[in-house]
A protein has these predicted regions:
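Positively charged n-region of N-terminal signal peptides that target proteins for export
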Residues: 1-4, 20
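Sec-dependent N-terminal signal peptides
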Residues: 4-14
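An acidic-aromatic
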Residues: 64-116, 186
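N-terminal leader/targeting segments and the immediate start of mature chains
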Residues: 19-57, 202-207
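Gly/Pro-enriched, hydrophobic low-complexity segments
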Residues: 22, 103, 126-207
């Protein structure tokens, strides 16, 4: 479960860097903050593919993500299994099958740290917070690329680096790559992205 939560952190970072359009690192960072401030809601479908180095195989999952400023997030797998993580203020819901677990973020050091990084991400602070990631930004004719090197011990134990790819023409995040220490690789591709469209409040219900 901890690996899933760390993937959610990365996904949050990706959603808020989606509008970067500049070529210089300083300009990109400025535009990230401005874009995050203007993003009230965000929703999309995603396909997650995990490539297993030792087995020469891959596992494909599909789902949906919803975000509402400033402290609501839902990450839901719909195929091949049903699993949902909902963050609503200081409360977290983890739903798997018929089991629902509700956690108070303030009573768990791990969840409190996860929530901090998530919220820093969605308000555009993650790429400037050196406590969490060392970041390298670059651009080409077709895309922007941000390479994140984890600085927190727990993330360093799992990930060697995280690569965010942005479609330069649309100025939207297109793909996230998580390179694990042992060589496995997870790729998350986003599609049908909607920004500042209404989201049903029930999506973020925690009970």
């Amino acid at each position: 479960m901890k690996k899933l939560l760390l993937i959610l952190v990365v996904f949050c970072i990706a959603t808020t860097t989606a509008s970067a359009q500049a070529v210089s690192e300083a300009k990109i960072r400025q535009q990230i903050e401005a874009a995050a401030a203007s993003m009230k809601t965000m929703q999309c479908d995603f396909v997650q593919t995990k490539y297993l180095r030792m087995l020469n195989d891959k596992m494909v999952s599909r789902g949906k993500m919803y975000y509402q400023q400033s402290d609501k997030l839902r990450w839901e797998y719909t195929s091949p299994y049903a699993y949902a993580f909902v963050l609503n203020g200081s409360r977290v819901l983890i739903s798997k099958g018929n089991r629902n677990d509700v956690i108070n973020v303030n009573q768990s050091k791990f969840f409190k740290e996860i929530a901090r990084i998530m919220m820093n991400s969605v308000v555009g602070k993650a790429l400037n917070d050196k406590r969490d990631f060392k970041v390298s930004l670059s651009s080409s004719a077709t895309e922007y690329v941000a390479v994140l090197y984890p600085q927190q011990k727990q993330m360093q134990q799992m990930f060697q680096k995280i690569v965010l790819h942005f479609n330069r023409q649309r100025a939207m995040v297109a793909k996230v790559e998580l390179i694990e220490k042992r060589g496995d690789r997870t790729v998350i591709e986003m599609m049908n992205v909607k920004v500042n469209s209404p989201i049903n409040a029930k999506v973020f219900t925690v009970n």
